[in-house]
Every structure is written in structure tokens, then in C-alpha cells.
Amino acid sequence: MQLPDALWLQDPALRRVVNALKVDGQPPRIVGGAVRDALLGIAVADVDIATPLVPADVIKRLEAARIKAVPTGIDHGTITAVADGRTFEITTLRRDVSTDGRRATVEFATDWQEDAARRDFTFNALYADPESREIFDYFNGLSDLKAHHVRFIGDAEQRIAEDHLRILRLFRFHARFGQGAIDADALAAAATHASKLMALSRERIADELRKLLSVANPAPAVQVILDNGIFASFLPEIVDDAGSRLAQLIERETASASKPS
């Protein structure tokens, strides 16, 4: 399968970055949200790039191509390239050495599937060759995307143990992309480990909740969160009918926005 051809793939800034990072003629790969959104027909905003090159080599190659390289997350292998006013996040392939639910210690790798295995959901682990547009799918992300099914890669409990924020990301991604019931294994794992959210900073939780509430209709996902007691450990003051009240508010706001002025 291929990415649909689109103007963003022909962006001269992207072409410059891709050409600078070729290894033995092979380009780096686009990964994550850009691939997912392109396949869904959603406008692509941010383009993230994965490469087997280590950060020092990424910086060297970018600078040789007169592209600004900013070491925004160099300990985790991430360099931000600034080309023609556009920014691209470039990350070296990685494997997790240890995790504590808040942060991971990583080491760099050269295996694409190993890098994919450390990601959260199957449709976020899709890679694409920016030149041939070939898609690389290691965990059946394409079929899950087609079915609008949000599924953790491998064992849901293990994915949550690696990063507790994935509990809330599950509901955000389901609210945005999912159809039907939330994946049963994912929901069970989220409910079991909900108390681990208390180990995270309030800033990270608040940011994720803002993202959830910014989707078109977050109310059903919020209600599932409430029904499963996931807010109880860190937001006990939220009333049980908050989901239905949020749905009513969205309905009123939608109706108000659609009225002729």
C-alpha cells in the first residue's frame, strides 16, 4: 500500500531534509501522525521523521545541507530541523532500556520494527517512504485504521506500564478516530492502572485532557472514563454525570453556531 500523493510530500523543505538524511541511497521514513492522517484524508500538519542515523550524524548532515539543526531532545535521539521556515522533528530509531511510567531510558537502534514496537497504538506505528510512498506496517495498523479501532501494540498493560499517560491518550484517540466500543483489553488495562496517573505531573495530565476536550465530540469518551472510575484517583470532584452534561453543552453550542445571524 502507498500513501496518497499530495502536495505536502512535494514540499521543497521536506525534500531537502529527506535528501540530507539518505543512507546508501535510502531515505528516512515519515512516521506516526502524518502517515495516519494522510491515509484518513485529514490535512497533514506536523511531519515527523525516523532515521537509523545517530543524532550526531543527523546534525552533521543537516548542517552540511545548510539546514538548521536544533537538539531539542538529543538524549532521546530527537533533533528539530528548520528548513525554509518549516520544522521537522527527526528521531533516531530507538529501543527502550528501562521505563518507569513517566520517562524512558533509551538506546539507539537500527531496526525499524524494534522502533515501531515501542510506540503506543498500531496506527501510530505506520512508516512511509517519502519518495516511493510505500507504507511499512509492522503491527496491523492499516487494518485497525480502516476499522477505526484504537489498539495498543502488543500487551496493553505493558504499554501503559511504560507510559501511564497512555491511559488518557487511549480515550483521546478513540474520541478522535474510533468507532464503536473501546478496545476491551485496552479499557480493562486503563481501568486497572488508573491510579498510576497520580505519578504524573498535573501539567502533563492537564495538557492531555485539553487535547481530549478539543476533539469534535469528547462526551462519549469522557463518559466511559467516568463509568470506569478512571478519574477517581486524581479528579474525585468530577461528578458522575459529567459526560452527559458535556454532551448537552456540545449540543447547545453546535445548535447555537448553526443558527443564522
List each language-model region with its residue ranges.
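Catalytic cores of the polymerase beta-like nucleotidyltransferase superfamily
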Residues: 1-261
